[in-house]
Amino acid sequence: MESQRNILLIGLLFVSFLLWQQWQADKAPKPVATESSVVANATTNHSADVPEADTSVPAALTATQNLITVKTDQLDVQINPVGGDIVFAALVSHKLEQGKDQPFVLLEQTKDFTYIAQSGLIGRDGIDSSAKGRAAFAANKTEFTLADGQDTLEVPLTYVADNGVTYTKVFVFHRGKFNVDIDYKINNTSAAPLQVQMYGQIKQTIKPSESSMMMPTYRGAAFSTQDVRYEKYKFEDMSKSNLNQPTLGGWAAMLQHYFVSAWIPPATDSNTIFSSVSAGGLANIGFRGAVYDIAPGATQEISSQFYVGPKDQKALSALSDTLNLVVDYGFLWWLAVPIHWLLMFYQSFVGNWGVAIILITLTVRGLLFPLTKAQYTSMAKMRNLQPKLQDLKERFGDDRQKMGQAMMELYKKEKVNPMGGCLPILLQMPIFIALYWVLLESFELRHAPFMLWIHDLSVQDPYYILPLLMGASMFVMQKMQPIAPTMDPMQVKMMQWMPMIFTVFFLWFPSGLVLYWLVGNIVAIIQQKIIYAGLEKKGLK
């Protein structure tokens, strides 16, 4: 009985640590300002760093004149004609705050912060280099809009080199999507062969948290190769060593809670995933593509894709079979993936994420009911054996060997497994933790309303009603649990304090997580009543 309570207590403490850790993370000062304007003159903030050169020495640039604006049903983008870099990206369908029209800004370039997506052509005849600067593209207009009934929008930029070679860089936007195709079309009208190589990189300012006492949410890089399906690459690791991994396909990304930006080169090309840190404190991660030889008079097309948007697993999987791993469920991903699928399935029917959370909680609790019943049955049998176990302690005293043998004989005679109540707890805990991470990582819950006063399941209950109800439900569950006379008084006190501790943690937690825990507790109370009623009929208490 005591060992079962110890495991339960350890499990609760472990979950409470996870909750405290995430509360700290969510309350940490954000390292990035979300409201800002794009810098029009970027001679000092916009370096010409390219991967084949020493990026610690940025080249001088011609001042940016007119940014090219692109508006679709999902994206509001600004492109710098110098180099053709995406220097601003707002997600039209994802608002900064619920109930307001201002879109969430993911990419931006301000006086104090840079988060942009660069791409260009390097190599022997590349038009982008740290030594010579970036190509200054021309566009026939500076404003592009995806019209009603139009599924794709092309934004062509043109650059004519000194040798007469024409380079066309085309950005292709798609209705309903957050991915952008970047296509280079090179028409070699010169008399000499050309050798070029496409690259794409994401640059972000390394800005530490303002408070060292807080644990920031993960904001950093990640990549995938043919050997490593998914790996995070922290800013501090990037500062220590540069990444340089050849691969077939692959991708490179920058992550933050709910959102991601990523370069996805062709899966059939030989690429190199690289990283670097610039002198100005910019972390760079990206890819270098295959080398192309273009004969005189020939035309060559080179393409890649860039994604800037939410961590939508379906959309990410369509671009790469490993890009959806940026939705990081941790070591229990194999449990979390089917749970997320079931959550999406329920929501597609009921149309309310709060109701979907309730349904999936009921489903999980229902599936685990046999284990729960076995757990309480075993605990009841152990309680009934306490008088006999106490007699054995008095009979054998300090002779632990004889006492252990006598206890095993007693367990065998009474058909009781002393660990019978522990196994169900150990099996249930991973499922509950996996469900916790699914609710924490699912971007679909951002700004998702439930009912009544809960207008956003991704933020705390404004009136703290759900956390208080959750604490009350834990208190009821605790009172329903019989306490063995032999239980250590310190353990009893810790268990008594647990509802209050959890209530304090949950005060600032997302409403969706609190709803899940509250419903789970209510179902557990009902299940306990049913189980205890059946046990009493069998003479077990």
Swiss-Prot record:
Identify the NCBIfam families for this entry.
Answer: PRK01318.1-1 (NF002351), PRK01318.1-3 (NF002352), yidC_nterm (TIGR03593), yidC_oxa1_cterm (TIGR03592)
> What does the record give as the function of this protein?
Required for the insertion and/or proper folding and/or complex formation of integral membrane proteins into the membrane. Involved in integration of membrane proteins that insert both dependently and independently of the Sec translocase complex, as well as at least some lipoproteins. Aids folding of multispanning membrane proteins.
Keywords assigned by UniProt, alphabetized: Cell inner membrane, Cell membrane, Chaperone, Membrane, Protein transport, Transmembrane, Transmembrane helix, Transport
Assembly notes: Interacts with the Sec translocase complex via SecD. Specifically interacts with transmembrane segments of nascent integral membrane proteins during membrane integration.
Instruction: Tell me where it mainly resides.
Output: membrane
Q: Which protein family is it in?
A: Belongs to the OXA1/ALB3/YidC family. Type 1 subfamily.
A Pfam family recorded for this sequence: 60KD_IMP
Origin species, per record, is: Shewanella sp. (strain ANA-3)
Q: How does the record classify its membrane topology?
A: Multi-pass membrane protein
Q: What is this protein called?
A: Membrane protein insertase YidC
